[in-house]
């Protein structure tokens, strides 16, 4: 069965974490950079992905509930970001990954709005100066695009490379942060 852009099993549609069932809320919405898929838990935003590239949610144990109301705080701040009125996000994140991935993603959160860093810079920031390729792989697995700003990571040469949403979207996000992208209609509305 498909729900919210990711696959779930008809007979196994619940997430069990530490013996407790968890509901994940989701919604799809258009944005200035293409359709987005939001997924949140009671603890925070779990995923923000570009719809055509949305990853499958672990199918065995996920209970999904479509809810614009549950995702309203995230939607509001993303609207402010796309309109140029927000440079940092204040809502909680529920990041799930390896210790190395979490270290990379936390380092990405330190990159200021409108600035870029190289993969090598991130590797050095997390204390693994030669692990820039592993940093690239962690960026590729970043489940919360835009908010955890992997679009701000570029090659050491200064060129754009590698982005889960595609280089066109990476360029648009960087242009937005430089004030050169038309924001388009608010999220959660029809285009």
Language model features: what each stretch is:
Residues 10-130, 176-191:
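Basic nucleic-acid-binding alpha-helical/helix-turn surface characteristic of O6-alkylguanine DNA
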Residues 130-174, 181:
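Short glycine/serine-rich loop segments
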């Amino acid at each position: 069965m498909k729900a919210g852009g990711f696959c779930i099993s008809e007979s196994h549609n619940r997430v069990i974490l530490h013996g407790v069932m968890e509901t994940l809320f989701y919604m799809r919405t258009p944005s200035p950079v293409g359709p987005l898929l939001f997924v949140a838990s009671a603890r925070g935003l779990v995923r923000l992905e570009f719809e055509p590239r949305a990853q499958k949610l672990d199918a065995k144990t996920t209970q999904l509930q479509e809810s614009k109301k549950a995702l309203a705080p995230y939607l509001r701040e993303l609207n402010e970001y796309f309109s140029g009125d927000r440079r940092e996000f204040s809502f909680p994140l529920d990041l799930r990954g390896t210790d190395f991935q979490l270290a990379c993603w936390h380092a990405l959160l330190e990159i200021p709005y409108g600035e870029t860093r190289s993969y090598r810079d991130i590797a050095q920031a997390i204390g693994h100066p030669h692990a820039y390729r592993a940093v690239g792989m962690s960026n590729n697995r970043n489940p919360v695009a835009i908010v955890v700003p992997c679009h701000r990571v570029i090659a050491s040469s200064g060129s754009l490379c590698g982005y889960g949403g595609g280089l066109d979207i990476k360029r648009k996000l960087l242009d937005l942060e430089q004030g050169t992208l038309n924001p388009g209609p608010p999220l959660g509305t029809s285009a």
